[in-house]
Amino acid sequence: LGNSILNTANADGKDFGEFKVEGFPTSTASDLVTYGGNNDDDDSGILRYVSIRYGGSVLTDNNEINGLTLGAVGRGTTIEYIEVFNNSDDGVEFFGGTVDTKYMAMIFNEDESFDIDQGYRGRNQFWFALQKDVGELSDFGGEHDGGDGDDKTLEPFARVQVYNATYIGGGPDGKTGKGVFNLKDNFAGQYHNSVFMDFRGYAMAIGGESTIARANTAGDLSFENNIWYDIGSYDGTAASLTANGLAEELANVSEKGNTYANPFLGGTSRLGNGGLDPRPSASGAAYNTPMSSVSGGFYTPVNYKGAFSSEENWLKGWSHLDQLGYFDEPAAVKTDVEVVADITTDTTWSNDNNYLLG
């Protein structure tokens, strides 16, 4: 939890609101469960090579425990190489903030893979979502809200940027009617150079169209140069991009170089039999269709669409997905080391072990 700006009002109805993190009663007095402030450069530390497994809980409606909850975390924080595996709610949820992330993998989670709320405005690259392919267990790839509560006019709007995502849905046996995205409530984000495939529902459902239009008077909402494949119909034909066809307000969603084409990934098996390979063919659409350029020091310039190149799988060697044998060769079994004492000095941990925090 951090101290960057939310688009929720404080008790006086003014900016720089604070919130209690989900999973605790709103009457909880401790600052340890409170997030929000006025420092977008807030530093909440470093998370790198972290695997979060078999967690989460749905306590009540709109009161859940996500795999990773980021409340008002600022851009001074480092978050990269994160896996959330088989969580019973969202994989990750951003509640406002400005934190930048890279190499995020949301695997087999039972609600959304990536959830955005309360005016999140970070930069992101190399996001991977893989959803369950059995029954009614996984929702949208991304549920992206600009804000919450009754007042949808509060700023800042959610002007998040995502480059190089790969979202693989549940396929023809996945959850009924759940598509790639659910956008609503002043969302004004962007996706570029990404691959979205294997979802039963629409590519995009749009709610609260009046608030979406208000947040996007400058055309900030943009889905540019992405690949869409096997969305809804599963017969090789292009599916409708939006559920309610707001073409006038949202031309940037359906235009700007979006392509309906097979990215020819190496494999999408969810059986743990070595048949999963999210890398695209170098001779396919991921390498041979127009791309958005990147600028600034955060983004890594690459010549492909999606979260993976044709050669490298950045989940190999450390992720639970790899350890369970989903890729072509299972990773070496690591030793579990239980950590029960407080860590008060600089400590070096080995990649040969799994460290279990007690």
Tell where the protein language model's regions lie, with residue ranges.
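Extracellular beta-rich repeat passengers
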Residues: L1-D89, E93-T344, S350-G358
